[in-house]
């Protein structure tokens, strides 16, 4: 994907293209806005337009270089009214230092200085020109440049840089924001191009809150089951009893000798006889000494 007038180091790798294809970033819509025709590769038989990923990467690199020129990262405002972009813009802001507006865009954020949420950004990046039309409109009033993720049916009014991509899919939105954040860090010099980024694209993907709750409940249930198993093992160890047939039994030979009256010297009775015998022997030794 070598492009004229652009260093080879800025070109997309095979891994980048595979990720874009896997996330369906090339899948457009059936409607086509006339100014988006330059970014369309072809039209399928079912009417869906396919975007040119080469131009997608070209505009993504251009947008990253523009964002990197802003001295104060907080002067870059990333906006996403679309639900699938909420987590993506928050992660983008966390990694690049930008200001995120996730959710409903309050009218007057860029124009009404009396409002508590008033901001004066130098650049804004939006997820969808249709869903974020209010932010683009206010940016045009105060001459703020706009970068937008644009589908084939997106309106390009007041959009300065359009990144052609699928801006309706959960994975496609998250991946474009991920690649944009990574490219911004690389252009700034914060991240080396030779070393992979330790952040996974999945971190930028939207997750259903109910799904998160179910996963947390499953983790809690697993932890409770493991703790209960440990308690049961401890109780079983405390109540452990020897049930072997040899436990507590008497050697048959010893029992037979005892019942037959064969008392050895190691028994208590034998010890008593041994004492008596010892005393007699001692007296005999004394008599023998006197006789001598």
From Swiss-Prot:
Q: Where is the composition biased (Polar residues)?
A: 274-285
Q: Which Pfam families match?
A: 40S_SA_C, Ribosomal_S2
UniProt keyword list: Cytoplasm, Nucleus, Phosphoprotein, Ribonucleoprotein, Ribosomal protein, Ribosome biogenesis, rRNA processing
UniProt keyword annotation of Cytoplasm present = yes
Which residues in this protein are found as Phosphoserine?
45
List cellular component terms (GO): cytosol; cytosolic small ribosomal subunit; nucleus
Q: Could you say what a knockout of this gene produces?
A: Deficiency of 40S ribosomal subunit formation, this is likely to be caused by insufficient 18S rRNA stability.
Family according to the record? Belongs to the universal ribosomal protein uS2 family.
Q: What else does the entry mention about this protein? A: There are 2 genes for uS2 in S.pombe.
Q: How does it assemble?
A: Component of the small ribosomal subunit (SSU). Mature yeast ribosomes consist of a small (40S) and a large (60S) subunit. The 40S small subunit contains 1 molecule of ribosomal RNA (18S rRNA) and at least 33 different proteins. The large 60S subunit contains 3 rRNA molecules (25S, 5.8S and 5S rRNA) and at least 46 different proteins. Interacts with eS21.
What is the recorded name of this protein? Small ribosomal subunit protein uS2A
Give the source species. Answer: Schizosaccharomyces pombe (strain 972 / ATCC 24843) (Fission yeast)
Gene giving rise to this polypeptide: rps001
């Amino acid at each position: 994907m070598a492009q004229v007038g652009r260093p080879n180091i800025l070109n997309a790798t095979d891994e980048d293209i595979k990720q874009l294809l896997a996330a369906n970033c090339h899948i457009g819509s059936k409607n086509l806005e006339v100014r988006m025709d330059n970014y369309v590769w072809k039209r399928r038989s079912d009417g869906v337009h396919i975007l040119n990923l080469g131009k997608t990467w070209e505009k993504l690199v251009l947008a990253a270089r523009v964002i990197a020129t802003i001295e104060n990262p907080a002067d870059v405002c990333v906006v996403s009214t679309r639900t699938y972009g909420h987590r993506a813009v928050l992660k983008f802001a966390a990694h690049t230092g930008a200001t995120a507006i996730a959710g409903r865009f309050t009218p007057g954020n860029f124009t009404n200085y009396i409002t508590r949420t008033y901001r004066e950004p130098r650049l804004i990046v939006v997820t969808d020109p249709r869903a974020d039309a209010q932010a683009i409109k206010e940016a045009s009033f105060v001459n703020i440049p706009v970068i937008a993720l644009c589908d084939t049916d997106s309106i390009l009014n007041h959009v300065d840089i359009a990144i052609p991509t699928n801006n309706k899919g959960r994975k496609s939105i998250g991946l474009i924001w991920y690649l944009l954040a990574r490219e911004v860090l690389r252009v700034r010099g914060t991240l080396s191009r030779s070393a992979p980024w330790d952040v996974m694209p999945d971190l930028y993907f939207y997750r259903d809150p109910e799904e998160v709750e179910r996963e947390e409940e499953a983790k809690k249930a697993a932890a409770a089951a493991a703790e209960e198993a440990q308690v049961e093992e401890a109780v079983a160890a405390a109540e452990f009893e020897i049930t072997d047939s040899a436990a507590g039994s008497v050697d048959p030979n010893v029992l037979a000798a005892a019942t037959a009256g064969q008392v050895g010297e190691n028994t208590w009775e034998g010890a008593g006889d041994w004492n008596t015998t010892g005393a007699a022997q001692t007296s005999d030794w004394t008599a023998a000494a006197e006789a001598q």
